[in-house]
Amino acid sequence: MAKNVVVIGAQWGDEGKGKIVDWLAEEAGGVVRFQGGHNAGHTLVVGGKKTILRLIPSGILHESLDCFIGSGVVVSPEALLGEIDELNAAGVKNVEGRLKIAPTCPLILPYHIALDQAREASRGKGKIGTTGRGIGPAYEDKVARRAIRAADLLHPEKLREKLDAVLAYYNVQLQHLHNAEPVKAEDVMAVIEKVAPRIAPMITDVSRVLNEKNKNGEKLLFEGAQGALLDIDYGTYPFVTSSNCLAGAASAGAGVGPQMLDYVLGIVKAYTTRVGSGPFPTELFDEVGVGLAERGHEFGSVTGRARRCGWFDAAALKRSIQINGISGMCITKLDVMDGVETINICVGYELPDGGKTDILPCGSDAVETCKPIYETMPGWRESTFGVKDYGALPENAKAYLKRIEEVCGAPVAIVSTGPDREETIVLHHPFA
């Protein structure tokens, strides 16, 4: 029996992870974020009411459920408290009492944001598509061993010493490399002094609590952010995020052993989208792509940026299945494909040397040269929106799902037919 489930995005993010985590959370004893920051939003719809979460795990709407932010997450204190305030205003109960933050979480502070935005502005046409929220610089500090972490909020005198040293490093870059204004220590301390009293009580040994819950037989749900094809190591580098987005990162990012990760659920959109720069072999530039974007409301929930849309890329998904060890797939937004007369599935790529491959190459330079090889399938006119029974799906929709399974080599466990948590078809429950 699977006891703990890891949910990851299997494409370039925006696959619909939030809804599925919220849905699975009904059976969990805890939900854990293990990587990323507040650079992407997870959208939940319950009873027609929309909630967008950026840092807080998507299980927070279940009012008796503990939620955890593991050490693999970089935390903006201001963004976190803003999110808590939004949930409080919406009537969600005891958010601060149920939210636990690892003391080892690196903090995102004003100088991270300043450098992130200054760098992106300096890149000109070479922009990598950063959200400008300080995620990358915060991860740099972690690796360079100069990060200010959540635990430092408990020791303001030592924190100030660390801050002075960090700002000396940052301000040289801001002033002399990017011709930007320096960040003042007093301004950063003002932010810290404002947020510390509220965040300090939430700081908890997350690793210990999770291991105790597991020992006591409670089911845990690990919630990934972004998508596997944005992974810092295996994504389309350098057009990637700054963290490891793979299922394996749940172990290090939450502080649990890999033997605790029983089932990996890959969230997969029924077509493909990407935000920002980077190669995208199946991207559509015609009315079909426009239609997918309009019907799928393909705009970032945090940034508002339009998402690029394209055909389903099974070759890219095969790479994701391989590097994540995906146990089962959840296909989301199947209803967006309603009415598409003819559907293409990318099953491989032609390479510049005349060869072929059935799996996404590594790195953006190699992917940019790939020409998609398509299989064509008939679409369906019937509506799949809100369908909750697999047998009620149109025959061509079922054939589409079956072909995805065959080409990718992983089973479809769940099908999402709408944004609400109830608009879900279950073929195999990950916790079963």
Curated annotation (Swiss-Prot):
It catalyses: IMP + L-aspartate + GTP = N(6)-(1,2-dicarboxyethyl)-AMP + GDP + phosphate + 2 H(+). IMP binds at D14, E15, G16, K17, N39, A40, G41, H42, T131, R145, Q226, T241, R305. CDD domains: AdSS. SMART domains: Adenylsucc_synt. Binds 1 Mg(2+) ion per subunit. Substrate binds at S301, V302, T303, G304, R305, A306, R307. GO terms for molecular function: adenylosuccinate synthase activity; GTP binding; magnesium ion binding. Mg(2+) binds at D14, G41. The active site is at D14 (proton acceptor), H42 (proton donor). Its EC number is 6.3.4.4. It comes from the Bacteria. Keywords: Cytoplasm, GTP-binding, Ligase, Magnesium, Metal-binding, Nucleotide-binding, Purine biosynthesis. Pfam families: Adenylsucc_synt. Pathway: Purine metabolism; AMP biosynthesis via de novo pathway; AMP from IMP: step 1/2. GO terms for cellular component: cytoplasm. It is found in: Cytoplasm. Its cofactor is Mg(2+). GTP binds at residues 13-19, 41-43, 307, 333-335, 416-418. GO terms for biological process: 'de novo' AMP biosynthetic process; IMP metabolic process. Homodimer. NCBIfam families: PRK01117.1, purA. Belongs to the adenylosuccinate synthetase family. PANTHER family: ADENYLOSUCCINATE SYNTHETASE. Plays an important role in the de novo pathway of purine nucleotide biosynthesis. Catalyzes the first committed step in the biosynthesis of AMP from IMP. This is Adenylosuccinate synthetase. It comes from Neisseria meningitidis serogroup B (strain ATCC BAA-335 / MC58).
